[in-house]
């Protein structure tokens, strides 16, 4: 069969890789990579760039961090974080001050539905199991 292909004069098309192997040039679009234009903000003048770098070094120094922390501890707007309501609760648990529900009926039987031992407040009133705005059906 190989002889039949040679005798018919059929030639395989030459691809770029074959031309490389045979030492022949091939046409392939090449991109010129330059670093002349890089996207980004415009360059600062030399004096302003030096001042910016100096301020960056000062801002990242330990002295500046300590000064900021001292200023933040003296800030009176964070007093609400130290309120007894928030400090006595465990993280991730519901606080009893916020989760108190007002019962809609007295006793063990719901007069509207006849349910025995069910919730005292309808959990589906707002479309999900929520009590005082806290969702409990994850």
Swiss-Prot record:
<dbReference type="InterPro" id="IPR012875">
    <property type="entry name" value="SDHF4"/>
</dbReference>
<dbReference type="GO" id="GO:0044183">
    <property type="term" value="F:protein folding chaperone"/>
</dbReference>
<dbReference type="GO" id="GO:1904231">
    <property type="term" value="P:positive regulation of succinate dehydrogenase activity"/>
</dbReference>
<dbReference type="Pfam" id="PF07896">
    <property type="entry name" value="DUF1674"/>
</dbReference>
<comment type="subunit">
    <text>Interacts with SDH1 in its FAD-bound form.</text>
</comment>
<dbReference type="GO" id="GO:0005739">
    <property type="term" value="C:mitochondrion"/>
</dbReference>
<comment type="similarity">
    <text>Belongs to the SDHAF4 family.</text>
</comment>
<dbReference type="GO" id="GO:0008047">
    <property type="term" value="F:enzyme activator activity"/>
</dbReference>
<dbReference type="GO" id="GO:0034553">
    <property type="term" value="P:mitochondrial respiratory chain complex II assembly"/>
</dbReference>
<feature type="compositionally biased region" description="Polar residues">
    <location>
        <begin position="71"/>
        <end position="98"/>
    </location>
</feature>
<protein>
    <recommendedName>
        <fullName>Succinate dehydrogenase assembly factor 4, mitochondrial</fullName>
    </recommendedName>
</protein>
<feature type="transit peptide" description="Mitochondrion">
    <location>
        <begin position="1"/>
        <end position="32"/>
    </location>
</feature>
<comment type="function">
    <text>Plays an essential role in the assembly of succinate dehydrogenase (SDH), an enzyme complex (also referred to as respiratory complex II) that is a component of both the tricarboxylic acid (TCA) cycle and the mitochondrial electron transport chain, and which couples the oxidation of succinate to fumarate with the reduction of ubiquinone (coenzyme Q) to ubiquinol. Binds to the flavoprotein subunit SDH1 in its FAD-bound form, blocking the generation of excess reactive oxygen species (ROS) and facilitating its assembly with the iron-sulfur protein subunit SDH2 into the SDH catalytic dimer.</text>
</comment>
<keyword id="KW-0143">Chaperone</keyword>
<dbReference type="GO" id="GO:0005759">
    <property type="term" value="C:mitochondrial matrix"/>
</dbReference>
<dbReference type="GO" id="GO:0045333">
    <property type="term" value="P:cellular respiration"/>
</dbReference>
<dbReference type="GO" id="GO:0034614">
    <property type="term" value="P:cellular response to reactive oxygen species"/>
</dbReference>
<keyword id="KW-0809">Transit peptide</keyword>
<keyword id="KW-0496">Mitochondrion</keyword>
<feature type="region of interest" description="Disordered">
    <location>
        <begin position="71"/>
        <end position="138"/>
    </location>
</feature>
């Amino acid at each position: 069969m190989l002889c039949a292909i040679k005798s018919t004069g059929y030639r395989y098309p030459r691809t770029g890789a074959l031309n490389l192997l045979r030492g022949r040039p091939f046409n392939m679009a090449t991109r010129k990579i330059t670093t002349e234009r890089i996207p980004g903000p415009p360059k600062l003048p030399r004096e302003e760039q030096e001042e910016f770098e100096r301020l960056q070094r000062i801002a990242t120094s330990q002295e500046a961090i300590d000064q900021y922390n001292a200023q933040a501890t003296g800030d009176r707007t964070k007093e609400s974080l130290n309120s007894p309501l928030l400090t006595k609760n465990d993280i991730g648990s519901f606080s009893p001050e916020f989760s108190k529900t007002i019962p809609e009926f007295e006793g063990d039987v719901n007069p509207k539905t006849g349910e025995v031992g069910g919730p005292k407040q309808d959990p589906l009133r707002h479309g999900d199991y929520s009590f005082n705005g806290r969702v409990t059906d994850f």
